[in-house]
Amino acid sequence: MSKKSLLSYTAIAAILLFGTYHKTQAEELKELKVSDGKKMEVSKESYENIWAETGGKIIGKNLKLGSSSPTPPSVTTVVTVKGSDSLIELSDNTIIGAPLGTKSSYEYGVNISDNATFKMTGGSINVDKTAIQLNAGNGNMENVTITSENSEPYNAIKAEKKSKLTLKNITVKKAKNSIFADNQTQVTVIDGSFEANETAINARNGSIITLNNKAKITSLNGDGLNAIGEQSKIFMTGGTVTGSNSVLYTKTGGYINVKDVVLTANGKGTKFGAFARGHSTIELNGNTTIKNASIGVKAESDDATIKMTGGSIEVTGDKAVGASFLNTTSKENTLKDVKISSGNDDFLMDKGISADKGSIVTLNNVTVTKAKNSILADNKSQITITGGSFEAKGEAIIAQNGSSITLNNGAKIISSEHNALSAIGEQSKIFMTGGTVTGSNNSLYATLGGYINVKDVALTENGESSVTGASAEGPNSVIELKGKTTITKTLFGLYVTDGGKITSEELTIKGKRTNIEGIELPSMGVNAAANSVIELNGKTTIEKVDFGLVASNSTIKMVNGAENKIDATIIALKINRNGHIDLANTSATAGVAGVNFADLSQNKLNGLSNSNPQDWQNSEVNLTNTDLIVENGIGINTDESMGKINLKNSKILADTLFKNIKQKTKPVEMFTLTADHSVLQGGVRNDENGQTRFDLKNDTKWTLKISNNEKDDDGNLLDIAQRSRSDISTLNLDNSSIVFEKPTEDHYQTLHIGSGKPNTQEVYNASGDAKIYFNAQWSDGAPIADQKTDRLLINGNVSGNTSVYVSGRVEKNSSQANTSAAPNVRGLSLIQVSGKATENSFKLVNGYTTRGGLPDMYTLRAYGPDSSQGNADIAQNLFDEKNENFWDFRLQPELLDSNSGSNPDPETNIPTVAPVPQTASYLVMPNALFYTGLTDMAKQNALLANIRTSVLGKEEEKQTGFFLYT
């Protein structure tokens, strides 16, 4: 044996005996194995493999390990450290396996087990399958590159059975999984880059992985971070995670918590930014962002939970959803201060947030933009929203199939082309307090039994105008507007149909006409159709609308203790097919008509199936403490329609009070107006086929006036003769009065009552203190056509007694009595009756009146069948069908006969008109006069002074105005 060989063997023997050997020579050894508590330090050496066990320790620097093929080939691991207190520590650019870029002959790089410890600083690991395996081992690695040239690599780092591993600035490439921690293992990652073909970071079965200081995680075809199993947890602060299937994924009790992390899909159709399933939880905090996923975050089944505070979600791809919750009843599902949007200005995500199959979600100050639908709650899910902003092109907020959504604290909801809030289906509910809602179609929409309740919410336009502020369609569909609600720039403020219902408290509606496809549509404040109900239970203001309230086979109630207002440019109240409107404490104005009962003929023209007149007879309007003013239009328009209108303590003041001029056939029912302690103003236009009844009672006053604005179909002002005629079928006057307004352009008015048809019942019925006030220009014996007076022509029977008042003036040469004329043509014909009447049907109060302040007495004489005054003169008959058996009530002077002791006027030789009984009294003691009539007691002194002036001026033939009083 040579001396050199002897020295080598001696050195080896010393290592085995004493446990320490400093190798400085360059010889290549196949294997380095240290055990039994021994320690070996090596540097710049190459080994096929090294092994430390049973407390053995290897400290290596700048080593090349496993760079050549193993001998024997069955050896598959380069570095093995096993057993408690065993240690291998490598540094200074040590290479395990093949050099980078070359294929390795070893399958496994490092195996650490049984509480052994492995440390590595710098260098690289390049093997076919797994670079680091820990089985109840401990590891600490820094600045190491791990890769594989194998086409099918395994886990880069696999740690299990309560292993502990710290990785600092580690780079992993070309791995199936970068880190796989199993069975209560703990892995701490600081910085570094981890790339994998499948899942990059895995925590299983109670293991914990913590990533800090901006680690970079990339999965080419799988999940970025994956935690599966109870107590399996991944924590990450800073850095980026890129995934293909899911960027973050947990299930069966796993937990992931990331903060200030950028989560990015890799552009290969990544489905989920963060996906939690089955009792698992993902928390995203700080400025965490999710980009390029088709579903930003998702929690699915068995109390799976997503919590996200701060940050943003950008999604893309077909059917993209910002946040999805499916079959998860976890009350911890929360998004707070999160912005959700499409990642492309030209792309709209399908849904911003979706909750399905009984899921529970809480949103706090969340913003959703660039979505088809902002929020969908389906199949008995629950979403609670505080603040935030939700914009969508389609329906913004949807609750359907028994789901509920609650919005609080001023949320802002916008739909640019559809409904803003939609509740669809039985038990589907939306509650909202405060905030604004803007919809292009409907701001609020309930259908198929859906329910919406909003309080102190403003329903606004979408920049142009909205179709409807709130719409309820279908049986049991309900919208309740609580607190103070404003609706602006909408075509319809409120709309219900097919059995829906809307109620409101304090409500303001400001309408706006809408242009659709070049057609300008009129706006409506409130519209109820098809057996629906609207109840306006608080102060209501409706303005800038064409139609105020519209009811078709439905009911609208605006009965509350507040002061309400309706300002309509066309019609204040429109009734259609058994519609009902109840109004109280309201001030209403309209440009064309105050109340319009729909034109039945127009419905027939339009081919509507509901044009049977019997279906229209129950339309009704009830006004209490309401003022309805139509200065230039019609108070009540009922063209070929039927129904009722009832007033109590109310007013209708119009240019024309009532109009029905399109009645082509005799209606089934009579239209009825009932006024109780109310005021009416305007004339009446009634078609000859129309049947209209006015019931005036309890001190109601109807003032007839000549229309100033009534026009024909061509827009031309009607002749004043047409405008001064009023027609009505039946009039019941109970403790009420009719007043003819002073003449216009020297034209007086005529009120026609009744049709004169055979078997007609009483068409004029007076009871209690019924009164009629006429205007007249005195003449005596003038032809009937030349007499200037208001008239009442009753073409039918009369019942009861009416007090008559007359006022007017006297013209020059018309003050003298015409005793040459027959008695039944003298004076003025005020009232004519074609049917049954009595001499007492119409009487001047106290039986007489005076003229021009003079003491001359005038009476109202009745000429007709069975009259003590004789028959009326047929030449005086003003009815279309001439018949001598009519009644003519005429204002005539009471003349003194030859037996009275009075002498004729010496100049005219005309018998003297009989003086009223009080003549001597009021000439001698004017202050003692008891006077009744149109002038009250406070004015008697002035009146008597005028009387004395008239008497003194008679001899001088002065022409003074006269007022006929009783």
Language-model features: locations:
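Extracellular beta-strand/loop-rich repeat segments of large surface/secreted proteins
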Residues: 660, 664-834
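Glycine-rich beta-solenoid repeat tracts in large extracellular/virion proteins
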Residues: 27-33, 48-54, 73-84, 102-114, ...
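A common structural microfeature
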Residues: 55-57, 76, 85, 959-965
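Beta-strand repeat architectures
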Residues: 33-38, 51-58, 81-88, 161-162, ...
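Secretion/assembly modules of Gram-negative surface proteins
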Residues: 2-12, 20-25, 29, 41-43, ...
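Strand-connecting loop/turn motifs
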Residues: 115, 699, 957-961
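Beta-strand-rich solenoid/repeat architectures in extracellular/passenger domains
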Residues: 35-47, 57-77, 87-106, 117-129, ...
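Surface-exposed intrinsically disordered loops and tails
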Residues: 601-612, 709-720, 865-877
